Amino acid sequence: MKSCIIATGNELTEGIILDKNSKYLAERLKSVGYDTLKITNVKDDLSLIKLSIEESLEMCDIIFLTGGLGPTQDDLTVQAVSESCNIDIVFNEELFEKIKKYYYNKTGKYLSILKKQSYVLKNAEILQNPVGSAPGQKVHFNGHTIYLLPGPYNEMKAIFDTHIYDELKSNMKNDHVEYSLYFYGLTEAELMQEVSVILKNFDYSTKIEEYIGPSLRIRMQKNDDFEPILEKILSQFSRYFIGFKSLEITLFDVLMKSSKTLSFAESCTGGMLSDTLVSIPGASNVFKGSLVTYSNESKVRLLDVKKETIEKFGAVSEETVKEMAYGLKKIMESDICVSVSGIAGPSLGSEQKPVGTVWYGFLINEDFFALKNVFTGDRDEIRKRATYFAFWNILDLVRKRYL
């Protein structure tokens, strides 16, 4: 089955926001066996939206449109589908009452502009929105199925997960299984040079996980033996292999498995380590906390770093991250304490310590060691690379010591 995705909105075509909707839909569709042929971002222009719909009808069995279901003048998706497919628009009284009730309960008032959301395609199946006012719609046209979903990511996702995913899954006879392998510190070209030979008889794709490395997705028949394939891949790339999930989730899993706790003392990363980790549900089982000690004064006051240490060696030094790690241990009492201090730039670098220099301190129980790396990129890129480098090394440490 072939699918197309059309995401509407000036905020997409002007680069104001990223198209998370299409990414999510494409991944979910692929997981149940749909082949997404085309993803289109189109501005809030009726003729352009109609053109995208008509092009998609030429090539796809199932079409998803996201955005353009709100109450304003530039919400044009229902009208575009109506005109492209010659489907009437009708007023839905029951839906109108639900929308009025939703807004009254939320704000204590009703706005007449909201009535527009009650005009739907004739004979459409209404897909109730569990987290917002704009419902989704499902219509059939000349052997095609068209879904209209709201633009806000949480609303689109809620409707898809609640009303659509299970139905799509049941409609597909899926005799395939997909494996995902994640790698750190490896280029896509290096991976592909070997994998293209190993996987020549299988369907596979690679993707760059930003600031980390490539991921490899392999699609096989359920009765194919995956183990020999995995062994061949790992015989070449075991030292780069993260696991079958993303780096941060794999780190969380191994901390859970080993029953170890983790804390951070962050300087140049500014809370990025903790922010990335706590995005995982259940992080409180392994993560005790983080201190963002960005200034030298905060390192001294909160982590008991000696003023003389910073004056003699600098804030970005092995000596400083060591004292940061031990100071963190006194406060958090975690099994693993990690400190980070670096120069994210764009200024303050020197010949001895260029922009991108980052020192790490790793304190596991009473064993300490330090690492230094020099990252490239702008300020934000350096901070992100520094974050994932820390995760990779913590993962490696926990595996070697506890698993």
UniProtKB/Swiss-Prot annotation:
TM spans (from-to): none
Similarity comment: Belongs to the CinA family.
SMART domains: MoCF_biosynth
CDD domains reported for this sequence: cinA
Name the UniProt record assigns to this protein: CinA-like protein
